[in-house]
Each structure stands twice: as C-alpha cells, then as structure tokens.
C-alpha cells in the first residue's frame, strides 16, 4: 500500500494539530513496519521544508515538499479549484490522507481525513473569520467525499456523525498520546515558589480568565505559570506579579515545568480531546480539568473536575488536587499509559485496509 499523507501543518511551530500529525506518522510508520510506503507531502512556505524535516526526524517516511510563495493562498486555491489531482504532484497512491483544512483533489484511491473538533460550527464566536471559512469548507468536503474520517475522541466522533451527517461506519476513533519526553523521570523546573501550570494558546475557548480569577481567590504565594502561543480575542489580565507568562517553549522545557508543578489545570470550555491533560498525567502531576464532556476521555477517573465558568469551583478543585496529590499522580500515570501512537498507527492502517476492499 502506498499512503500519501499531507503534513503541511508541520510548516508552523507545533501546536495541537501539528503534534497529532507528527505522532500519527510516527505510529503509522511503526505499525507499517516497512510493509507499506508512506509519502509525507506538503506544498509549503519558504521556511516550511526545514521545519517539516525537523518534525519528522527519525520517522521512516519519504518526504516531499515544495516551496511556494503565498503558500497558504495556493493551498486554498488548490483545494477549491479541484485540480491538478494529487497524483500529478506526489505520484500514484492507494490512500490520500489530508490532515487539517487543506483538501487536495484526487482521481482514485481511498480518501481519508482527520477532524479534530467542530468548534468553528458550534462556537463561531471563539474562532476567527478565517478559521471559520477554512474549516467550514473542509468539513463540507469531508462529509461529501471522504471514505474515512478519523477523529481524536468518541466525543468528536459522535459530533461528526450527528452534525455533519457522516455515516458511522466511515468514522474511526484514534486518540492521541503523550510524546516520550513526557515522563516523571528527569529534571523539574523551579520558578522561585510553588506554581500551578496551564498550557493553552491565548484564545477565548481556553478560558484563561476563569483560571486567573481562581488563582486570585487562592491567594498566598502560589504562582500561576502560563505556557502557550499568542492567540486572539479577549485576553485575561496578566499583570499580577504572581503570574508567569512563559510563551511557546520546547517539549523538553514543558516536561520540566509539568514535573515541577503542584497542579496542572486545563479549564477549556470545549476540546476535541485535550492532549495537555494526558501530557501532565504522564509527567506525574495531578490535574484539574473542566467538567465539559469533551474532556471526559482525556480525564478518565484520574482528575479533579470543575465547572469551567465558576472560578470558585476551579479554586476548590486546585486545593483538592493538592490534598489528593499522590492518589491523582498514581491514577494519572496509569491512565496516560493507555494512549500510544503505535495504537493510532494501527487504527489508521486498519481503516485504510477496510476501505480498500469495500
């Protein structure tokens, strides 16, 4: 089997979707064990090939990239124009898997995609106009043309079936896993005092305002460390000297921060899965998570849950997590081990195989 896999999101610093693509390809290459050919391809920006090579280092795939001026506009145009067929770009294939908002045209073979969430449809106020337009086109194309739709959770799977009208037998759940760097073993960060850690792009959906208010209610010398890229929309006030804004950091730095935290908090109002929850567990830190059902699978029975819109409840959950630290640490480590990228790769291969014989 020859699998063409779109990796154009790896042209940018790795966030949730980029990490999912990187892990999926690692798991797919491991599960394929040399029996299948995997071509990772991307029409990308001038700096994109270097970033993509770095993201896929050590993963057994053939890489094909093309530097393009105005690459974003050209990828959009390619998707909407319906030509040229992807076969003319990457050669013949049995499966084409596109991974984010780009949906390349193809002449034959299995057509597959991954949908991470339907936030732009359910909560347009939490997204930009550009995001709504791009993902709206992708959702419509996936529903109309894809043989396979992979999702990152049962929650997203049900949402895709109910909202987009995609047949259940076309939907396959492939839950993400923490990277190997996220382990309880290794150095822990020190920020000059005990700290609560949150990992999120600064955008309304991540609900940092409620966490900032909860942190203020806790008082004392407890710091709040915020890791994540710049986002958009209304931002919380971060001028408290007890708040440390750390920005976008490497996985190695993030693992050290997880290990050093007294509690990790993920107060998001809506997720596809919520991989930072599992990353924190894998590093042995107790976790407080929003009670929204989209986070049930990442949480399992190994977190303290709280109403994301109630800062008092979040503050109480943080205090409880500190008291129950050892129980949550053990439960979280066990739960995090149930997720592997090898399992994701096996799910992808099984889906491709089933679609090829239909």
Segments (PLM) and residue ranges:
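Carbohydrate transferase catalytic cores enriched for Leloir-type hexosyltransferases
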Residues: 1-358
